[in-house]
Structures are given as C-alpha cells and as structure tokens.
C-alpha cells in the first residue's frame, strides 16, 4: 500500500543501527521501540492503519502526537498498560534525540499524552511534573485559529539553540546552571555585572516574566485576564525573546507580518494573537471573538491562503484507548 512503513524488530534490537536509510517516520517508530526496550519493557509486531488531522510543520506537535500513538499501542498490546505517561513521553523524546538528531525536550510529548491544556514544571532537573487544566475559550465565545505563514528559507537550528544557550550563559554569570535555580530579583540586582550579550538579558527577562504569566493563567478563570496574559506573552516573545524573525534573513518576516495584520483586523477588543511553537518561522495563534471569526479568516486567507488558516480546538483527551473511554 502507498505510505506503508515496516520496521524490522531485529534491526531495532541492534543498538548500532540508526536506521539512516529509512524515512523519518520509520526512524521515529524504530526510536520509540528501542527506547521501550531500553526501559525494560516489551515490543512486538502489529498492523496499524493511521490517519491524522494534525497539521505537519505547524507548531502543533505532529511528530510528538505520532510518537505517543506508537508508544500507546506498544504499551497496550505488549505491556498491559504498565508504562506511565512520562515513560511514553521519554520514548518519543529518545526517538527524536537519537534517531532524528533533534534536541527535543518533553513538552510536546507530555502535552499530547495528557490532553487538554497542560501545565508543566521542569524545575527538577531531568524530570517534569504536570497537570491538566481548562482554558475556557469556547464557553466564553472565543475561537482559536492557527495561521501557517510558511516555513521560511533559513536554517533555524542555530536560532532555536541560541535561546537556551544564552539563558544558560546568564545563569552561569549568576552562579547557577539554570535560570530557575535563581530568581528574577537576583537577576535584576546583578544585571550590570552581566556583560557582552544584551539579547541574552532580554531573553532572561522574558523567561521570568513568562513563568509569572503561566502561573496566572493556570490559576485564573477570568477570560479577560487570560487573554491579557496571552497578549502580553506575544508582545514579550516579539520584543524580548525575539523569536519572530531570523537574524540572518531579516527581510523575511512572515510571522511579524501575520501578527501586525492580525492586530489591525482584531482591533482593541476582538481577541489576541501571538507567535506559536518554536517561532522564527511558521505559525501564529489567534484567539478571536466568535462574532469576528468569519471576517478574520477571510482577511487572513487573502494574504496567507485559505488552506493555511485553520480553526482549532484543544482536544480534552490525551493518550487513550478508545474502547476504554
């Protein structure tokens, strides 16, 4: 069949085999399988017919959702459901780190596995705690819309990796390894002593302020307060984190064009928008009043094409077996 993939278990068991001759999808399957074996669990053969409505390369965790599907199938068929959400997520992370050579964390995998809006805390080094909570957009008359502005033509690897590296450098100047090991006030008290990279200072300030905004949203049921935090987060990403365009391709700013046009179309009380995903290219997220959705979609479609403007919702279910629901 067209699109059929097949992963040989014997190759998975060979730890020297990195599946370099196979497709990205096959490498993910192999990576998840090997991670499961490394954790001491079982794998086996199965046939699966897979369809998806997750948009690829759009900041909505398409690879992580596929990894969690494969991990969930293996967990149910061969391990009696004994693998935890964290273990399934780590299997997906391993697949990307080792078989894709991509420095993925656990955020996307946990979000897909848990379902709903998910609060995550990575303060304990090497671990994550998480809980699901509600974002009351639909019940308050708002719709989420993703606008895919295009991939861009720059290699984004250096742009992505520079963000944590610069934050690590500031943390080191403050005498610790990570920014969460110290405080915003300690950073502000010593800001004149940290020299050589002003962008790193701005990104550090974003880190501390963003964590405060996350805590506010998690604890709030006030839709206006939640929207305000999203709007402030978007401005901070644009101004402080600076992940809305690529330094080496400054003439290509589709993200900032989409944000600027959205703000024009939305007005002062029609909703909010921000860069989505890793940034630098790709997708923005808009949360729009239902009464303005059709007009907003039409206007953004005229610029970015209708196929790139999608109404979305947050699925309340994570990694589940349908018959158990």
Predicted regions located by residue number:
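C-terminal nucleotide
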Residues: 1-24, 35, 42, 119-274, ...
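Acidic, glycine-rich active-site loops and adjacent beta-strand->loop/helix elements
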Residues: 2, 50-56, 89-99, 124, ...
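Internal, well-ordered alpha-helical segments in soluble enzyme and binding-protein domains
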Residues: 28, 50, 66, 88-91, ...
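A generic "binding-loop/recognition-motif" signal
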Residues: 116, 280, 315
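N-terminal pre-core extensions flanking Radical SAM catalytic domains
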Residues: 278-285
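Fold-level recognition of mixed alpha/beta catalytic cores in primary-metabolism enzymes, strongest
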Residues: 58-146, 323-324
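Anion-binding (especially nucleotide phosphate/pyrophosphate-binding) glycine-rich loop
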Residues: 1-91, 255, 261, 265-266
């Amino acid at each position: 069949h067209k699109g059929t993939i097949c992963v040989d278990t014997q190759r998975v068991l060979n730890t020297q085999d990195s599946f370099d001759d196979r497709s990205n999808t096959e490498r993910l399957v192999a990576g998840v399988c090997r991670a499961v074996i490394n954790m001491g669990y079982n794998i086996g053969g199965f046939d699966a017919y897979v369809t998806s409505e997750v948009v690829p390369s759009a900041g909505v965790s398409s690879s992580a959702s596929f990894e969690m599907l494969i991990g969930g199938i293996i967990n149910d068929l061969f391990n009696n459901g004994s693998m935890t959400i964290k273990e399934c997520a780590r299997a997906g992370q391993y697949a990307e780190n080792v078989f894709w050579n991509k420095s993925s964390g656990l955020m996307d995998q946990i979000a897909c596995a848990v379902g709903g809006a998910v609060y995550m805390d990575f303060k304990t080094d090497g671990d994550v705690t998480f809980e699901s909570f509600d974002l009351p957009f639909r019940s308050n008359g708002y719709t989420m819309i993703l606008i895919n502005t295009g991939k861009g033509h720059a290699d984004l690897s250096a742009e992505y990796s520079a963000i944590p590296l610069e934050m690590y450098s500031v943390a080191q100047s403050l005498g610790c390894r990570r920014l969460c090991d110290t405080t915003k006030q300690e950073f502000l008290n010593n800001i004149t002593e940290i020299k050589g990279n002003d962008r790193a200072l701005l990104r550090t300030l974003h880190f501390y302020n963003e964590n405060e905004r996350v805590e506010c949203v998690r604890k709030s049921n006030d839709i206006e307060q939640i929207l305000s935090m999203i709007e402030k987060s978007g401005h901070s990403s644009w101004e402080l984190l600076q992940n809305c365009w690529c330094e080496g391709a400054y003439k290509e700013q589709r993200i900032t064009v989409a944000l600027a046009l959205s703000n024009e179309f939305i007005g002062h009380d029609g909703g909010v928008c921000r860069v989505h995903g890793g940034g630098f290219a790709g997708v923005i997220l808009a949360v729009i009043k239902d009464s303005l959705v059709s007009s907003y979609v039409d206007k953004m479609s005229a610029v970015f094409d209708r196929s790139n403007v999608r109404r979305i919702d947050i699925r309340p279910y994570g990694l589940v077996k349908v018959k158990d629901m």
